[in-house]
Structures are given as C-alpha cells and as structure tokens.
C-alpha cells in the first residue's frame, strides 16, 4: 500500500491511499510501484509525505519505529535481523522485521502483540498494530520539525534491504501464539 499524507498548517493531516479502488486497498507489486513513481514524485513536490505499508497474507512485516542509533544497534545485538533499515530523519531509524504467519486463528493478535513487544523494548512504545506504514525511502521526510533553514527536508535513506525472515522474532511469535492458544482453551472451559 502506498499512502500520501499532506500535513496542514493547523496540524491536521490529509490522507490519500494510492492503491485504493472502489473502497478496497490491495497494495502494489514492486513493478506497479515503479510505474507509479512519477505520480509519487508529483505528490512529494506538492509537499506530501509518502509511506509504504507492506501487506501479506503469509507474513507479518513488523515496523519498529523511532529508534536512535543505540536502540537499533541493541536490536541487532540482541539477535533480531531486520529485512529493512531506514534512516527516516537524521539520527532516527525505522526497522522492518519479517516473520512468517503461523497459520493459526490467532495470527492477527500474534502480529499485534509482537509489534507491541518489539516497540516497547526498542522503538516507539505508543506504536501499535502489526500492519503499519513506514516512510518511503528516497522521498523527503516533510515533517515541519525537520525543515532545514534553506527550506529543504531530509531524504529518507534506505540503509539495508534484504529478503529475509527473522528467526528470533519467529520464536517470540510462536511463544505468543502458544499463550493465545492457552488463553483460548481456558476461556472455552
């Protein structure tokens, strides 16, 4: 999914989902994103922030947001292996950890709890939900607080990208799923 958010002077946000058709968002393939790049560049020139939201039936793509360098290094030292690392603004990082869904009735809850746990430990403790947008690399972070004296904004930088799943996050996901199953069994009694 590609989302464009225009920040209004009064603090309000105007949101536009590029892949929404007939009220449904299905996401874009990498090829479709490439085809839509001219439109995305036009939106940026109009002052809009661009975000990607990875969507998958088979995997969770967990965003860990608002990390400084120390938290990012600790995340990696602790054994987590992000598929993507972005520098969303100078000294501020986002990581995306990919984990296969387990195919149980609790997949949504497992993803949400995994996101909560990782963000409480390493990122933004207020971030919730497994499906969450991250800044689009190669585009500007147009938050007013990041505007430079010359009127420009920092570009979101892609520091790392590889097709990988995180074994440590999968272990945590399995543990959370087992807890969900125990709770469901207890409630059923």
Regions found by a protein language model. Give the residues of each.
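Long, charge-rich alpha-helical interaction segments
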Residues: 20-21, 148-189
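A broadly tuned "polar low-complexity/structure-edge" signature
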Residues: 2-8, 115-121, 126, 130, ...
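Signature for HUH/AEP ssDNA processing cores
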Residues: 1-93, 98-116, 120, 182-183, ...
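Short, conserved secondary-structure transition motifs
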Residues: 97-103, 125-150
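Short, glycine-/Ser/Thr-/acidic-enriched flexible segments
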Residues: 69, 141, 163
